[in-house]
């Protein structure tokens, strides 16, 4: 953005990257035309962007049809012609008249904004307000919506009752960005979308103003790596009250001391403000580069003097790369240009104090500030040192000296890595901005006299570009100096302050800086979850950031994605559902995020038009589309266009299962998409998978996010965030005996309300009707059919293909409290943990809301997970409770050595009880169990019935797996478990459950669309509901439907051929056309899997159904099978359809986009050892990469957040 130049004391047209913001509406023209051409013409139907192809010097104009006349704008270098239609929106006349052009005036009097003597007419204010509100709602694509109409009515009512109105924060941000976008004199507007807006409208005193300004300077300077642009907006002008004003023209300026001989030491442009500072108590030095203090004025009060802390002002000594004597000149300049005396107008509201900053264009320092005769005027001194002949202008000594001074400026800013841009790069970026604006708005206001830099005029592309100058609103406007005329109200000279008073003011400001900054830096934490785990983590994150920010925690479906453009900090915690899809409450957010446009993805390639689900399932670092725009972003600079989310800082944590092919796909996609849209990532993506310590991963990621240098230093709250992270995530905070106590409760546990309380989801109760083993009695394994009676509850109304998450009470052969481990004695009275409130006195105990009142046995049975291996964090807590030193040392080692922990966990798969048996000296107090054990997580199963065939019932197909943890998790004979009903209890028992919709796994509504169903093992579960529904339609309604093909797979026809009789009966009654079964362990037969059946017997049908008949394919089963099928189908399509394999892969993408290739994948399988061994290998690989710094956080959670049959 650059030196947003104010001109109150600087006559002449200063140039550069500044918001010089003049409004001479008839600016200088470019080179003379070789032949007269009309400068005004009827506008074409659609504004045309500049054509950058070479053209003759005198192009032939094709006259558009008659219509409204707009200025024709020509580029004399390229010969391209456009029409500026945006100028029709200008509502203010310029200073020029038919007989005179005032375009070269620096400060046209007509365009200055002076304080009015009374409130503006209500109708005038309403007209401007309506126009702005319309602009805002059009920008967010909500024009004409109910919210738009309600906001207009709200503004009208406020103006009618108070004479003014107030902007919402999002409107203020939009208005400030538009004001910069509309500034005709600024050459750096291509970054207008990245303006960081600090809302200081709650400021009430000059002291608070100074604190906000210090924060602004600290943020914008950023240790030399200057922020793109920032503005702090103080309270608006209010009728009957004085204004907030900053008397200085810029926040950082050098003093100018008038000498007795009339000369000036320092910067002559600042003599007047220097004298005012001295009158208000400043004790000046006498140097050429003394930083001026600030004069700040609150309404109806005298201005107050504030000295900027020296460490806040970054200065750059100037030296030349080849001229060694240049450094001896003692020249220097400050790094941050920040204009502070201009007025911001938005929708008729005026903000007289709105300092804004950017970075310098080199010519602003090297040519204007140092070489102008009315400034430092060093040109001749440098020329003499260069031995140039200054006696004649034909020696070009001025040009030679000016170039070397500019070269010195650019060179000096490079070693300390202070942001600066040369005038060639700046003007090229402005041409790109003109092109962007012509496409987006039909034009761009520009003042040619200010856009063309002060040197290299015709060597820059802007010199050859005609421009149209006009005024749009919102806008930055000039205003009279506050000590002149009527603006000087309350500006009397205050007594001279002592040095001690000034020093105390600086000290107080420094102490308030972080506090006030934290109050105004908002953080938005978004979550999307199916089980509530991501929500729980988001709430923990909210508690962490509450001490340093102003956070709000929202579910994605409660958040308006439009607000992303105005956010400063967003943290996302989300799970991944199904096949890499967003959870249900993240669907709308995902779709809206994909619809937003970014600066690096404007290519019209067909990949851009794919649906968000395809992008989310394919987005990765290896995606060529992602790699392309990421490369462009790395090559971009401050002169390139900003994205829609240019001011956003973000960080993402994902939950999922590493057993799935699209592990954390939604989180990865959100992370990638936010960066693609221009956001700045504050930390690497954190990932938590099903089979590793999710809590540890999240804590590490949360601490990293809060302590991250970019996150904290950006918002000036580093120490507060670090302290908060230590307080929230410290193991010492997690458990202290004195912080917890148990109290007995009169009420007993009601299980259903208790589960709803714990899982924060609506749940329903059902009765177990029967539990039937579907496998042969000779089988060493078991699969059961569970029938549940729902009693017709509305919350359990389902469709075939949906999922349900039951909560059967877990059975264990070793219950706590029955000998063995040292666990606190079980009380059969309901207990409630209590803890002191934050900041409250120790006697003031409050209920811990984690669990409902229940006995310890009930908590361990229904709510807490005692079967998963304890996390390193829990082992660390156990080490503090071990009485035997050797056991304490071993537990500490396991908790701190990731590789030792993984070896121990994967070899033993120990439950909590087995850990206590291994370390018998650990004595567990009951409060620790109730407050520190992880919650028992539900698992989702595909519904195996159709409501039309079994009203009031839900059927589930469940594979029962028993594990011997002392023998590397090998399956054991589960017959005893099945005979006793397994974990489901006996007939008539109660179970609680949650219904989850699966709208993407449903039979097509057209009964004549052909389908292929692929489901080995328990993957047949949802298909049972499909054939029951089809059978009911055939027999009860007489509907004839296309008969799908079923491909089933099992080990042996005599042992585990699930539902064989039902399938055969359904085929005989016309439900299935073909049924094929793959046997992987059939005696005297080769191993055959479902993908082999597809390849050898159904290849032609697969191609015909998917490519020719627009049919559907459904795949349900474990992740290994689903991956194999997904690899097989493209090969079939390539072979049968005569296409390349890449093309066939694209076809699968299209099928998914059209929801014709459906997957229902689950992670836990009967091949437990195979899958877990593979994931274990991945885990160790990730650990090694983490130790090398390649993967910051990649941990797996102990509980699933994805569904499965």
Swiss-Prot record:
Region (Disordered): 1-20, 26-73, 796-850
GO molecular function: calmodulin binding; flavin adenine dinucleotide binding; FMN binding; heme binding; metal ion binding; NADP binding; nitric-oxide synthase activity
GO BP, one annotated term: nitric oxide biosynthetic process
Cofactor details (free text): Binds 1 FAD.
Biased composition (Pro residues): 33-47, 833-844
Entries under InterPro entries matching the protein: CysJ-like_FAD-binding, FAD-bd_FR_type, Flavdoxin-like, Flavodoxin/NO_synth, Flavoprot_Pyr_Nucl_cyt_Rdtase, Flavoprotein-like_sf, FNR_nucleotide-bd, NADPH_Cyt_P450_Rdtase_alpha
Binding locations of L-arginine: 250, 359-360, 364, 369
Location, primary (coarse class): membrane
Compartments (UniProt record): Membrane, Caveola; Cytoplasm, Cytoskeleton; Golgi apparatus; Cell membrane
Binding site for FAD: 803, 939, 941-942, 957, 959
Annotated positions binding (6R)-L-erythro-5,6,7,8-tetrahydrobiopterin: 104, 368, 449-450, 463
GO cellular component terms listed in the entry, alphabetical order: caveola; cytoskeleton; Golgi apparatus
UniProt: Zn(2+) binding residues: 96, 101
Catalytic activity: 2 L-arginine + 3 NADPH + 4 O2 + H(+) = 2 L-citrulline + 2 nitric oxide + 3 NADP(+) + 4 H2O
Superkingdom of the source species: Eukaryota
Protein name: Nitric oxide synthase 3
Organism: Ovis aries
Lineage: Eukaryota, Metazoa, Chordata, Craniata, Vertebrata
Designated gene of the protein: NOS3
């Amino acid at each position: 953005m650059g030196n947003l130049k104010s001109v109150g004391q600087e006559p002449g047209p200063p140039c550069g990257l500044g918001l010089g913001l003049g409004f001479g509406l008839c600016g200088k023209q470019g080179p003379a035309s070789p032949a007269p051409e009309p400068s005004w013409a009827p506008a074409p139907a659609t504004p045309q962007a500049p054509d950058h192809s070479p053209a003759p010097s005198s192009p032939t104009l094709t006259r558009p049809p008659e219509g409204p006349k707009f200025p024709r704008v020509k580029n004399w270098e390229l010969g391209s012609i456009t029409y500026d239609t945006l100028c029709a929106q200008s509502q203010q006349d310029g200073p020029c008249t038919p007989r005179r052009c005032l375009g070269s005036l620096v400060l046209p009097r007509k365009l200055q904004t002076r304080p009015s003597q009374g409130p503006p007419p209500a109708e005038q204010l309403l007209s401007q307000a309506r126009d702005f509100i319309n602009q805002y709602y059009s920008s967010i694509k909500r024009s004409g919506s109910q919210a738009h109409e309600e906001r207009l009515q709200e503004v009208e009512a406020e103006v009618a009752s108070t004479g003014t109105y107030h902007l919402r924060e999002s409107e203020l941000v939009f208005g400030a960005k538009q004001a910069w976008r509309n500034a005709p004199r600024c050459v750096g507007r291509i970054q207008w979308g990245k303006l960081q807006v600090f809302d200081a409208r709650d400021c009430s005193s000059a002291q608070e103003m100074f604190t906000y300004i210090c924060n602004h300077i600290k943020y914008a300077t950023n240790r030399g790596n200057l922020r793109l642009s920032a503005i702090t907006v103080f309270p608006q002008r209010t009728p009957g009250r004085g204004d907030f004003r900053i008397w200085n023209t810029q926040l950082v300026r050098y003093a100018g001391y008038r000498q007795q001989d009339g000369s000036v030491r320092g910067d002559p442009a600042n003599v007047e403000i220097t004298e005012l500072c001295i009158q208000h108590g400043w004790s000046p030095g006498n140097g050429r580069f003394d930083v001026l203090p600030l004069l700040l004025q609150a309404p109806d009060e005298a201005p107050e003097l504030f000295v900027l802390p020296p460490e806040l002002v970054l200065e750059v000594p100037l030296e030349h790369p080849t001229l060694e004597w240049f450094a001896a000149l003692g020249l220097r300049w400050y790094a941050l240009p920040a204009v502070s005396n201009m007025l911001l107008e938005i929708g008729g509201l005026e903000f007289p104090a709105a300092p804004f900053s950017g970075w310098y264009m080199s010519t602003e320092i090297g040519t204007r500030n140092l070489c102008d005769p009315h400034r430092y005027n060093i040109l001749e001194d440098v020329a003499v040192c260069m031995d140039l002949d200054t006696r004649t202008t034909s020696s070009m000594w001025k040009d030679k000296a000016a170039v070397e001074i500019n070269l010195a400026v650019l060179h000096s800013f490079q070693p300390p890595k202070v942001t600066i841009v040369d005038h060639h790069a700046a003007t090229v970026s402005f041409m790109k901005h003109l092109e962007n604006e012509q496409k987006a708005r039909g034009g761009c206001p520009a003042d040619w006299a200010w856009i063309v830099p002060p040197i290299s005029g015709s060597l820059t592309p802007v010199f050859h570009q005609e421009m149209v100058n006009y005024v749009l609103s919102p806008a930055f406007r000039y205003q009279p100096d506050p000590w002149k005329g009527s603006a000087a109200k309350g500006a009397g000279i205050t007594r001279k302050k002592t040095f001690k008073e000034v020093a105390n003011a600086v000290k107080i400001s420094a102490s308030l800086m972080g506090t006030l900054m934290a109050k105004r830096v908002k953080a938005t934490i978004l979550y999307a979850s199916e089980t509530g785990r991501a929500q729980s983590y988001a709430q923990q994150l909210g508690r962490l950031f509450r001490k340093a920010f102003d956070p709000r925690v929202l579910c994605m479906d409660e958040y308006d994605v439009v607000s992303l453009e105005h956010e400063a900090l967003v943290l996302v915690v989300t799970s991944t559902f199904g096949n890499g899809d967003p959870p249900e409450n993240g669907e709308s957010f995902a779709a809206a995020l994909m619809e937003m446009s970014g600066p690096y993805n404007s290519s019209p390639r067909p990949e851009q038009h794919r649906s968000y689900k395809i992008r989310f399932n394919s987005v990765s670092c290896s995606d060529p589309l992602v790699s392309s725009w990421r490369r462009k972003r790395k090559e971009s600079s401050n002169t390139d266009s900003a994205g829609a989310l240019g001011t956003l800082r973000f960080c993402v944590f994902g939950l999922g299962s590493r057993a799935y092919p699209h592990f954390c796909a939604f989180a990865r996609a959100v992370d990638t998409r936010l960066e693609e849209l221009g956001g700045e990532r504050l930390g690497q993506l954190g990932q938590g998978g099903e089979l590793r310590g999710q809590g540890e991963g999240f804590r590490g990621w949360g601490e990293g996010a809060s302590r991250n240098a970019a996150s904290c230093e950006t918002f000036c709250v580093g120490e507060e965030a670090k302290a908060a992270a230590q307080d929230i995530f410290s193991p010492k905070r997690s458990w202290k005996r004195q912080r917890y106590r148990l109290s007995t409760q009169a009420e007993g546990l009601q299980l259903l309300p208790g589960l709803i309380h714990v899982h924060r989801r609506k749940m329903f109760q059902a009765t177990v009707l029967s539990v039937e083993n579907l496998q042969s009695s000779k089988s060493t394994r078991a699969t059961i059919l569970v029938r549940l009676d729902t009693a017709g509850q509305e919350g359990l109304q389902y469709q075939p293909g949906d999922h349900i998450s039951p909560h059967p009470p877990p059975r264990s052969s070793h219950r706590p409290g029955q000998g063995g481990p040292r666990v606190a004695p079980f009380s059969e009275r309901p207990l409630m943990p209590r803890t002191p409130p934050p900041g409250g006195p120790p006697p003031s105990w409050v209920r811990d809301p984690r669990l409902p009142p229940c006995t310890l046995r009930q908590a361990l049975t229904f709510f807490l997970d005692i079967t998963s291996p304890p996390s390193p964090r829990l082992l660390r807590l156990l080490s503090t409770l071990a009485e035997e030193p050797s056991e304490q040392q071993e537990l500490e080692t396991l908790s701190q050595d990731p590789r030792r922990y993984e070896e121990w966990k994967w070899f033993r798969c120990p439950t909590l009880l087995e850990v206590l048996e291994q370390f018998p000296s650990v004595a567990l107090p009951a409060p620790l169990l109730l407050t520190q054990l992880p919650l028992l997580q539900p698992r989702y199963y595909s519904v195996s019935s159709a409501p039309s065939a079994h009203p009031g019932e839900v059927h589930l197909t469940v594979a029962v797996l028993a594990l011997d943890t002392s023998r590397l998790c090998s399956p054991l004979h589960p017959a005893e478990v099945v005979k006793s009903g397994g974990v489901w209890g006996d007939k008539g028992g109660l179970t609680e459950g949650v219904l989850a919709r699966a709208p993407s796994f449903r039979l097509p509504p057209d009964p004549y669309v052909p389908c292929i169903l692929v489901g080995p093992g328990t993957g047949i579960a949802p298909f049972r509901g499909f054939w029951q529904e089809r059978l009911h339609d055939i027999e009860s309604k007489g509907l004839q439907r296309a008969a799908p093909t079923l491909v089933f797979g099992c080990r042996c026809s005599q042992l585990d051929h699930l539902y064989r009789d039902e399938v055969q009966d359904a085929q005989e009654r016309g439900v299935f056309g073909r049924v094929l079964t793959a046997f992987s362990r059939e005696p005297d037969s080769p191993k055959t899997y479902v993908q082999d059946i597809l390849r050898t017997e159904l290849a032609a049908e697969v191609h015909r159904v998917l490519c020719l008949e627009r049919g559907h394919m459904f795949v349900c089963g474990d992740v290994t099978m689903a991956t194999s099928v997904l690899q097989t189908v493209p090969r079939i399509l390539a072979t049968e359809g005569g296409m390349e394999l890449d093309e066939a892969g694209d076809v699968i993408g299209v099928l998914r986009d059209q929801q014709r290739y459906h997957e229902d994948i689950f992670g836990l399988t009967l091949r437990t050892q195979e899958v877990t061994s593979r994931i274990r290998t991945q885990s160790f690989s990730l650990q090694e990469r983490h130790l090398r710094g390649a993967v910051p956080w990649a941990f797996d959670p102990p509980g699933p957040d994805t569904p499965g049959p």
